[in-house]
């Protein structure tokens, strides 16, 4: 773990505050192994009698939760972009494999059941990809405060659908590749990696259940009162 600075939510007298803590005396980090890799730098941070300068306060004291919330939209958008990109790579590998692999004297792509799988995978992926493009454009037309109000719900629902589609594509790719899908080398390596890591996106930045609830709560919040 090589980070020098850590943005940390801490309990202060007036509530949760965000501090920028520099590595130094009283701080210890221990690596936590994950199913992905060590590149994320996941670790346990131990703070003991650490002194932080007043100037390292991010935002107002006691308003740390707002700082966290303001960053959520962009974080979730990034997760959507990343998981959709990874899913597209897996689908691309499926197209390559089905046009190359021969079974019972025919290429896999000539089997109706395989084409049906690819059709379902492709249509689902293109749907969330275009939704991402739409939201990305809207983000460029709004300031950060407006985004937090107008796009929090749509981004949450996009994240929910993006990870659901990743689950579908990953699972179907495993069926298409067969035994190669559980090997870490050769043409199956991308499929194996996706099987092992796609749940990261479904958890980080808020789980699928929380995204679903947030999306509907935000939609209901702006919905006019019913009139009979």
Labelled PLM ranges:
Residues 1-28:
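A short core secondary-structure module
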Residues 4, 41, 156:
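Exposed loop/turn and edge beta-strand positions of beta-sandwich/beta-sheet ligand-binding modules
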Residues 11, 35-38, 203:
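A general structural signal for short secondary-structure junctions and capping/turn motifs
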Residues 15, 33, 42, 171, ...:
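A generic hydrophobic-helix recognition signal that picks specific residues
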Residues 22-53:
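Flexible, small-/acidic-enriched active-site or ligand-binding loops
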Residues 26, 36-38, 61-63, 187-194:
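Short, surface-exposed loop/turn microsegments at beta-strand edges and helix-strand junctions
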Residues 46, 70-228:
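Alpha-helical interface subdomain recognition
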Residues 49-67:
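Long, acidic (Asp/Glu-rich), low-complexity accessory segments flanking structured domains
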């Amino acid at each position: 773990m090589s980070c020098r600075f850590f943005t940390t939510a801490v309990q202060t007298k007036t509530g949760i505050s965000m501090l920028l803590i520099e590595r130094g005396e009283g701080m210890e980090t221990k690596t936590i192994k994950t199913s992905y890799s060590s590149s994320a730098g996941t670790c346990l941070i131990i703070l003991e009698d650490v002194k932080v300068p007043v100037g390292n306060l991010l935002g107002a004291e006691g308003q740390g939760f707002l700082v966290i919330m303001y960053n959520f939209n962009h974080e979730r958008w990034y997760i959507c972009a990343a998981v959709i990109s990874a899913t597209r790579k897996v689908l691309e590998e499926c197209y390559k494999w089905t046009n190359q692999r021969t079974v019972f004297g025919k290429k896999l792509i000539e089997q109706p059941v395989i084409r049906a799988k690819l059709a379902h995978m492709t249509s689902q992926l293109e749907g969330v990809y275009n939704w991402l493009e739409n939201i990305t454009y809207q983000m460029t037309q709004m300031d950060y405060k407006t985004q937090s109000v107008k796009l929090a719900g749509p981004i949450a629902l996009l994240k929910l659908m993006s990870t659901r589609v990743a689950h579908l594509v990953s699972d179907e790719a495993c069926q298409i590749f067969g035994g190669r899908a559980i090997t870490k080398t050769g043409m199956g390596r991308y499929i194996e990696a996706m099987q092992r890591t796609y749940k990261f996106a479904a958890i980080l930045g808020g789980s699928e259940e929380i995204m679903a609830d947030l999306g509907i709560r935000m939609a209901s919040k702006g919905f006019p009162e019913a009139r009979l």
